[in-house]
């Protein structure tokens, strides 16, 4: 990942601002700071976009005092080129899920009744035009994902930079349910 970023850095010019979306405990960012500083020196600004209070990236601030490392809660950046990257970030965002049954689209919802969770289907007229999917198909839409991508792409189109998204999920053309719940 670091080699890829350094090669992009050399190709598109000087980008001193790096932002990780959803750094969790900061493992990837720590590795990147080590690698990138060897190639680019310490005139690099690192931004950590983490919405969850459950994860702590405080060790990055202690271990790398010579770098500018900022934790941010909103996707708002200085008017400069940025390089954004994330690992499994978009998987953690909420989705609205729809299922096609008897040639009709339904929104899948979770209902709590008598202290038990159950899946219910609510008819949805929004997808009536989507006919190429067969019964049993699942569509997942994330308004928050669209908002974040729009902000990042607008920033990149105005000020330049790059964006690396990686995910280790399986590739499947089949429209399947990807929601998981861990208790």
Mark where each language-model region is.
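Conserved adenosyl
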Residues: 3-96
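Class I S-adenosyl-L-methionine
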Residues: 75-183
